[in-house]
Amino acid sequence: MSEHNLKGTNANVPASDSPLADALWAALGTVEDPELRRPITELGMVERAQAVSEDDGGYVADVKILLTIEGCPLKTTIEQDVRKAASTVEGITRVQVEVGAMNADQRSALKSQLKPERTNPFTAPGSLTRVFAVVSGKGGVGKSSMTANLAAAFASRGLAVGIIDADVHGFSIPGLLGVQEAPTRLDDLIIPPAVDAPRERGQVRGGSPGGFVKVISIGMFLKGNQPVAWRGPMLHRALEQFILDVHFGALDILLLDLPPGTGDIAISMSQLLPNAELVLVSTPQHAAVDVAERAGTLSLQTHQKVSGVIENMAAMTLPDGTALEMFGSGGGAQLAQRLSSVLNYPVPLLGSVPLDVSLRTGGDEGTPIVWGDPNSPTSAEIQAIAGKLLHRDESLAGKPLRLNV
């Protein structure tokens, strides 16, 4: 019995004894950690990988994987992916996988590799991540639903998307996206859970597979439906930690779901992410428009750009073809016109999303309508809004960059 070993398997480019060993390593390099979205061979997660000859002339792939933490909920997924990848190597007739966990030193080394310093990656020179803060003047206008569905729309185009649920007192993003996993901790570094855009629907309306949404929310750190009673300084520190201590990796888009109004979080966001573009959500109702205008004009003080207005809960088309204007009409266009006048630059109406029961039920079930019913008129409107937000001629925005730095 002979062995074809990979030596120094915690290095990115290990020494090898044979082409079979090289092929096994290359196959393992196609396996990504589901949260970090990086090859396990780059993350020091492969402790052993060897091809051992058997009496029948075949080879068994003997692999040991180190998970980042004990009791990792993604253990089964990673193990299955490793087995599948190793079994594709020509000459391998059997695969055996041992699963362990990193020790403290290995986790510390991984943390240093992922984020050597506690810095803000979204304001760093050369950052190509577009940052959008989704805001509203008042609650109940569907701001969080729009945030979740915009993220789904971006991901369906093959983009890497992150969401910070900054509505600390009224967090809801994990539920709207069906995210139940808790974040992974590497010392003081937080790895957010991710949800993939459905592959079978990734091609809808010109999209591409491979997109995903990473989510962080204060709700992931609480038991049950526990309320949060925090004031300004605590709210600022929470947002700061989400920005500085959460490892999102390379993102094309970062969305923030802000609480309604112009309070502490809105001010903290402008200080921590001055490059964030504001997207206002309002219903057509004129009372909602008046409040939303105040949220938009705050940008004069924070020196941030308002990229547009989304009118949510617009006219619903009934089975007989008539339109039901539950919340009136024209509010979104009126808001865009008012802000254009006050801010002295064009603020477009990005789109009018109709009142749709499926949007609500999809949120309750944790499946955004953009994924659950991608060919519906509502999904088409949200996709069109996402396309308008991505359009910026002078940048690379909207292109999946996938840079691992």
Model-derived features: positions:
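Residue-level signature of catalytic and energy-coupling elements of molecular machines
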Residues: 28, 46, 72, 86, ...
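Short, hydrophobic beta-strand segments
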Residues: 2-12, 59-69, 132-134, 277-278
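N-proximal, solvent-exposed amphipathic alpha-helical segments enriched in charged/polar residues
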Residues: 2-47
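Phosphate-binding loop that captures ATP/GTP phosphates
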Residues: 154-230, 236-237, 243
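Walker A/P-loop phosphate-binding motif and the immediately C-terminal alpha-helix
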Residues: 130-169, 296
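Conserved catalytic-core segment of NTP-binding enzymes
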Residues: 245-248, 252-352, 357-361
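Extreme N-terminal, non-catalytic leader segments
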Residues: 42-55, 61, 68, 75-136, ...
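C-terminal boundary of histidine-terminating zinc-finger modules
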Residues: 365-378
